[in-house]
C-alpha cells in the first residue's frame, strides 16, 4: 500500500502534470470506487479546473476551487497521464479527459481505491469523522499529545501506529522502520512505553517519513510515481523485507513475525519483547 512518502511523491508528480488543466469529461468503469453520489460525480467534474493537488495523510486532495476530489490509492492505485491515445488495459478504471487533449488515468489492479467529491468547506469534517491524526511534522505532531494518547491505551504499539489516529500516513513498511529505529518491540502495549521510547517513536516517525519523501518513496511491489519512475527508499530500509539479513545496528539476524495480522520485521536483540 502506498504510504505517506509514496502519496506525497505522487502528489508532486500530479501537480507537475495537471495543474491548471480543465477536466472536460470523466469515464468511470468501476462505480463502487466512488463513495459519494455517482450522478453528481459524473455531471459536476466536467468544466472543473485543477487548481492544486494536496495531501492529507495517505489521501490525495485534488482542489477544484469550491470542491475537492479526495482520492485514496489503497493497495495498488496509481495515476498515469497519456498525452494522446490511451492504451487498452483492464486495470484502467477512471479516465479524466483534459482540455489539452491528454487523459489522466487511475489504474488499480485490486480496485480498492476510493474517490469522494466533497465541498471544500466539508474537508475538515471529512477527516474528523475518520479520526485522522496529525501530519508527521514538528509543527503539528506534538510529543505531549502523542504521549498522552499512548499511555491511555492498551493497544499493541504497531497496530496503534497503523490505525492513523496517532499520526497520519504510516503503513506497514514505515511502522517497521520506525519501531526498529526506536528499539521498540511491535507487540509492546502502548501504555507500557516509557518516556524515552515515546520520544524516540515520535522523532523517528518524523525523520523516517521525511527521508521516504526525499527518496521518492519505496518501490517494494508495484509502486511507481505519477511520472512512471520508481522510488529509491527501498535501498534505505533497515528491517522491512530484510528477513535473515544482519541487523545494521547489532548484527543479529532480522526475523519476520505476524503482529495484528500483518507481516512484521524486527531485530530480536534490539527490539526485545517485554515479559
UniProtKB/Swiss-Prot annotation:
Keywords of the record: DNA damage, DNA repair, DNA-binding, Glycosidase, Hydrolase, Lyase, Metal-binding, Multifunctional enzyme, Zinc, Zinc-finger
Residues at the catalytic site:
2-3, 58, 262
Which residue ranges does UniProt annotate as crossing the membrane? Answer: none
**Which chain segments does UniProt annotate as zinc-finger regions (FPG-type)?**
238-272
Free-text remark on how the cofactor is bound: Binds 1 zinc ion per subunit.
Is Hydrolase tagged as a keyword?
Answer: yes
A GO BP entry is: base-excision repair
Its Enzyme Commission number? 3.2.2.23, 4.2.99.18
Q: Which cofactors, by name?
A: Zn(2+)
Q: Which Gene3D superfamilies match?
A: 1.10.8.50, MutM-like, N-terminal
Q: Which family does it belong to?
A: Belongs to the FPG family.
What is the protein's given name? Formamidopyrimidine-DNA glycosylase
* Organism annotation: Streptococcus pyogenes serotype M3 (strain ATCC BAA-595 / MGAS315)
The coding gene here is mutM
Amino acid at each position: 500500500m502506498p504510504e505517506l512518502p509514496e502519496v506525497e511523491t505522487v502528489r508532486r508528480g500530479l501537480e507537475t502534470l495537471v495543474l491548471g488543466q480543465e477536466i472536460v469529461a470523466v469515464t468511470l468503469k468501476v462505480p463502487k470506487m466512488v463513495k459519494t453520489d455517482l450522478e453528481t460525480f459524473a455531471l459536476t467534474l466536467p468544466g472543473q479546473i485543477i487548481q492544486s493537488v494536496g495531501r492529507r495523510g495517505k489521501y490525495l486532495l485534488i482542489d477544484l476551487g469550491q470542491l475537492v476530489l479526495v482520492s485514496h490509492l489503497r493497495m495498488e492505485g496509481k495515476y498515469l497521464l497519456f498525452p494522446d491515445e490511451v492504451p487498452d488495459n483492464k486495470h484502467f478504471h477512471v479516465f479524466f479527459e483534459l482540455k489539452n487533449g491528454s487523459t489522466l488515468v487511475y489504474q488499480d489492479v485490486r480496485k480498492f481505491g476510493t474517490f469522494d467529491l466533497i465541498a471544500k468547506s466539508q474537508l475538515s469534517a471529512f477527516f474528523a469523522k475518520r479520526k485522522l491524526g496529525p501530519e508527521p511534522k514538528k509543527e503539528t505532531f506534538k510529543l505531549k499529545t502523542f504521549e498522552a494518547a499512548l499511555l491511555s491505551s492498551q493497544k499493541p504499539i504497531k497496530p496503534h501506529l497503523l490505525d492513523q489516529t496517532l499520526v497520519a500516513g504510516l503503513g506497514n513498511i514505515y511502522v517497521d522502520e520506525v519501531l526498529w529505529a526506536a528499539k521498540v518491540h511491535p507487540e509492546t502495549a502502548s501504555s507500557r512505553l516509557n518516556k524515552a521510547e515515546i520520544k524516540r517513536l515520535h522523532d523517528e516517525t518524523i525523520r523516517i517519513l521525511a527521508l521516504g519523501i526525499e527518496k521518492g518513496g519505496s518501490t517494494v511491489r508495484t509502486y511507481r510515481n505519477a511520472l512512471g519512475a520508481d522510488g529509491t527508499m527501498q535501498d534505505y530500509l533497515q528491517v522491512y523485507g530484510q528477513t535473515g539479513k544482519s541487523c545494521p545496528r547489532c548484527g543479529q539476524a532480522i526475523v519476520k513475525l505476524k503482529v495484528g495480522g500483518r507481516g512484521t520485521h524486527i531485530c530480536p536483540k534490539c527490539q526485545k519483547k517485554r515479559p
